[in-house]
């Protein structure tokens, strides 16, 4: 590639590193173009799967502030990166599921919210439910606790009223 083209690729990759919430590094040796297209579709709207030269990717990562040698050392062999803009769990699930079906895709590791991740950690992340599901479960738990508290607070005055009524009825009977 001529020098201006390489600079443009480095600039694009640098922007991807800076604007992404996560980057998952994979090895794609043996995948066909059709399989790569299928993988890109399976990742959805919030992730972008890029194939770039390792040297250019390392330069872009360093320019973007990625200094962790664990991540940079993963850039060996035919590497591709899934840059995640939204829900990292959804993208991790897409990569894990595709890797199960296609043994040629190997998850090498990644960088999520600036922290290096091993392939095992990315697989564990894929086992989690999505952010929206977890938030809805949390909201449901809060609502249930509030309903229980409201029932307790409502029960106390009603018990007191019934007690006073029972005492009044008893006094009325005794007179």
Curated annotation (Swiss-Prot):
GO biological process: translation
InterPro entries to which the protein is assigned, alphabetical: Ribosomal_uL10, Ribosomal_uL10-like_sf, Ribosomal_uL10_bac, Ribosomal_uL10_bac_type, Ribosomal_uL10_CS_bac
Any Gene Ontology CC annotation: large ribosomal subunit
Pfam families recorded: Ribosomal_L10
Naturally occurring in which organism (per UniProt): Thermobifida fusca (strain YX)
Entry's family note: Belongs to the universal ribosomal protein uL10 family.
Annotated GO MF terms: large ribosomal subunit rRNA binding; structural constituent of ribosome
Subunit field text: Part of the ribosomal stalk of the 50S ribosomal subunit. The N-terminus interacts with L11 and the large rRNA to form the base of the stalk. The C-terminus forms an elongated spine to which L12 dimers bind in a sequential fashion forming a multimeric L10(L12)X complex.
Cited function: Forms part of the ribosomal stalk, playing a central role in the interaction of the ribosome with GTP-bound translation factors.
Protein's name in the database: Large ribosomal subunit protein uL10
Keywords: Ribonucleoprotein, Ribosomal protein, RNA-binding, rRNA-binding
